[in-house]
Amino acid sequence: MAPLRFSANVSWLFPELPGLPERLHAAGRAGFKAAEVAWPYTESPQALASAAQTAGLRLVLINTPRGDHEKGEMGLGAVPGRQAAFREGLEQAVLYAKALGCPRIHLMAGRVPQGADRAAVKGEMETVFVENLKHAAGVLAQENLVGLLEPINTRITDPQYFLDTPRQAAAILQKVGRPNLQLQMDIFHWQIMDGNLTGNIREFLPTVGHVQVAQVPDRGEPGSSGELDFTYLFQLLEDEGYQGFVGCEYRPRGDTVEGLSWLRSYWDRRGHPRTGQ
């Protein structure tokens, strides 16, 4: 089995540094060959592309814009009445992805509207999401890009988020039926919502285009204490033939580089793979 390929999520890692270009440089110095950025839109794509190139990094994932952050929006894909804004945000994300050479975009579903009952609006929100995803799949296909759906847990992180379980996301992907749309598996969220990680990984991995990791419940380094045995989980991903990237989307408990001892141990044991696509 090939060793896993890890990417530094510089929206989370290196918080001791002020900006995304500085964090990209730090990720390269720490040994990463790939990086991801949740929201790159505060920087010009040219500045980010230059920083990534200087750092020897391949950018592998960005998110669509949040929407109106002051109004509490966290993505727009499933939000009724915000279809035009979702499509505008998608266009912006595609421009960034092309400029950065980034092959994947997380298509954020968004939150259940404030004051609405989740059960009452679920059908309408799913209909909006499916329509938006069909549109997005066509736009992305023209640029040879992949769109990702990420369930975010509603127990701890975001109680209002619409898409919260892998089964819900997989069912929506099946309704959309586009090969360039895939699952984004954040093991932190999946553990909190469903547990049963071995079964869920084996069931859903064929449709997974990207993985992210953090310890549960504090969202710290995989090497920190918590519910998850990452030695086992990394081996499981290898055994199941996962060939995508594993994003380090966690909250460092202290100095980021010191906290990467778990990853250095993995590289010492399994080798440092080429990044590829």
UniProtKB/Swiss-Prot annotation:
Taxonomic superkingdom: Eukaryota
Annotated TM spans: none
EC number: 5.3.1.22
UniProt-annotated catalytic positions: E150, E249
Keywords: Isomerase
Top-rank EC class of the record's enzyme: isomerase
UniProt keyword GTP-binding, yes or no: no
Molecular function GO terms recorded: hydroxypyruvate isomerase activity
InterPro entries: HyI-like, Sugar_Epim/Isomerase, Xyl_isomerase-like_sf, Xyl_isomerase-like_TIM-brl
Reactions it catalyzes: 3-hydroxypyruvate = 2-hydroxy-3-oxopropanoate
Keyword Isomerase included in the entry's annotation: yes
Protein purpose: Catalyzes the reversible isomerization between hydroxypyruvate and 2-hydroxy-3-oxopropanoate (also termed tartronate semialdehyde).
PANTHER family referenced in this protein's UniProt entry, alphabetically: HYDROXYPYRUVATE ISOMERASE-RELATED, ISOMERASE
Protein family membership: Belongs to the hyi family.
Annotated protein name in UniProt: Putative hydroxypyruvate isomerase
Species annotation: Mus musculus (Mouse)
Recorded name of the encoding gene: Hyi
